[in-house]
UniProtKB/Swiss-Prot annotation:
One of its GO terms (molecular function) is integrin binding. It comes from the Eukaryota. Residues 34-57, 110-205 are extracellular. This is Tetraspanin-8. Its main location: membrane. Structural component of specialized membrane microdomains known as tetraspanin-enriched microdomains (TERMs), which act as platforms for receptor clustering and signaling. Participates thereby in diverse biological functions such as cell signal transduction, migration and protein trafficking. Promotes ADAM17-mediated TNF-alpha processing through recruitment of ADAM17 to tetraspanin-enriched micro-domains (TEMs). Forms a complex with RICTOR and integrin alpha3/ITGA3 to mediate mTORC2 activation and AKT1 phosphorylation leading to cell migration. InterPro entries: Tetraspanin/Peripherin (IPR018499), Tetraspanin_animals (IPR000301), Tetraspanin_CS (IPR018503), Tetraspanin_EC2_sf (IPR008952). Gastric, colon, rectal, and pancreatic carcinomas. It is a multi-pass membrane protein. It comes from Homo sapiens. The chain crosses the membrane at residues 10-33, 58-72, 84-109, 206-230. It is found in: Cell membrane. Keywords: Cell membrane, Glycoprotein, Membrane, Transmembrane, Transmembrane helix. The keyword RNA-binding does not apply.
Length: 237
């Protein structure tokens, strides 16, 4: 009877240890986004709703599942447990199929997702002219974004701020003369609105997510191969 290849066994262990670390990283990052002050300010208002956190909550679940699978894979490899390896294989295969399905749905409903982003941004415009405490947190987050990207307002420029425009002395102040400016209520403000910068920001991050997902899919396929080879070798001992 053939023995278990030490190379396959320890390659499987190393792979799953790295996989487990990836799970910790994803989980930690998602939790940080979920509880950070900036994300609370942007997504935490009642007007925006809790649906904005769905993607973050999914990442928390994915990170936890990857940690569990990494643990199963490590223990299965070291203990040469066919049961653990089979559970690892099934779990990893389900995650891979879910990633493929998500990618297909994302491509099919891309236009719809773009429309949802537009509607959300337009809906959030009214928060800039509101006076409540929860809206104030959102406003402060947008002010930081405006200063970084040298833009003003979300859709209609400085007019989006309504009466709040007078409450923030340096709001939208056009300090970079290389950027287009315009006069509003006796002040020179940035002419460009922030909606295009936000869309570009989301698009760039989406490309990063797609790249990470593709790399993760390759790693997952290797994990499936390693686990099945080791599973068969243990059965043939």
């Amino acid at each position: 009877m053939a023995g278990v290849s030490a190379c396959i066994k320890y390659s499987m262990f190393t792979f799953n240890f790295l996989f487990w670390l990836c799970g910790i990283l994803i989980l930690a990052l998602a939790i940080w986004v979920r509880v950070s002050n900036d994300s609370q300010a942007i997504f935490g208002s009642e007007d925006v709703g809790s649906s904005s956190y769905v993607a973050v909550d999914i990442l928390i679940a994915v990170g936890a599942i990857i940690m569990i699978l990494g643990f199963l894979g490590c223990c299965g490899a070291i203990k040469e447990s066919r049961c653990m390896l089979l559970l690892f294989f099934i779990g990893l295969l389900l995650i891979l199929l879910l990633q493929v399905a998500t990618g297909i749905l994302g491509a099919v409903f891309k236009s719809k997702s773009d429309r949802i982003v537009n509607e959300t941004l337009y809906e959030n415009t009214k928060l800039l002219s509101a006076t409540g405490e929860s809206e104030k947190q959102f406003q402060e987050a947008i002010i930081v974004f405006q200063e970084e990207f040298k833009c003003c307002g979300l859709v209609n420029g400085a007019a989006d701020w309504g009466n709040n425009f007078q409450h923030y002395p340096e709001l939208c102040a056009c300090l970079d003369k290389q950027r287009p400016c315009q006069s509003y209520n006796g002040k020179q403000v940035y002419k460009e609105t922030c909606i295009s910068f936000i869309k570009d920001f989301l698009a760039k991050n989406l490309i990063i997510v797609i790249g990470i997902s593709f790399g993760l899919a390759v790693i997952e396929i290797l994990g499936l191969v390693f686990s099945m080879v080791l599973y068969c070798q243990i059965g043939n001992k």
